[in-house]
Amino acid sequence: MYIYKVGVVGAGTMGTQIAEVVSYAGVPVVLADVNEVSAQRGIDAVRAIYQARVAKGKMNPEQLAEKMLLVSASYGLDGLKDVDLVIEAVSEDAKLKTQIFHELDQICRRDTILASNTSALSISALGAATTRP
């Protein structure tokens, strides 16, 4: 399976850094958060990462503009219905993550890969909130 578009749930520090890495690799990425303000803050954070690269001479302004064309925002999870991979990157709250995985299971295509950036919670427990293997 090829990954043509990625979704990241959570526009905090980890989510924005994941979105930056994905877009830097040349893959379109949708950064999803609960509201417009949070999602836009995430987009601004990705732009700031790229601007720091421009300031250091590691990329030029045209490259920054090209990379930012790959980054979009979604206010809620509905904007992730056509992605190939979703990476959940919200706070380490089992109830919240379980709810997100349940919703993603309903919204995303059957062949969409659902992944988590959790470092402390059981991935099996999160996966149990879906109807996927």
Can you say where each PLM-predicted feature lies in the sequence?
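NAD(P)+-binding Rossmann beta1-loop-alpha1 motif at the extreme N-terminus of oxidoreductases
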Residues: 1-49, 72
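Phosphate-coordination loops involved in phosphoryl transfer and adenosine-cofactor binding
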Residues: 2-5, 68, 83, 111
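Conserved N-terminal Rossmann-fold NAD(P) cofactor-binding segment
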Residues: 35-84, 94-95, 99
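Rossmann-fold NAD(P)-binding glycine/threonine-rich loop
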Residues: 93-133
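Redox-cofactor binding/interface segments in oxidoreductases and associated redox assembly factors
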Residues: 87-88, 116
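Short glycine-centered segments of the SAM/dcSAM-binding site in methyltransferase folds
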Residues: 28, 85, 113
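Short acidic, glycine/serine/threonine-rich loops at helix termini
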Residues: 20, 43, 84-85, 123-130
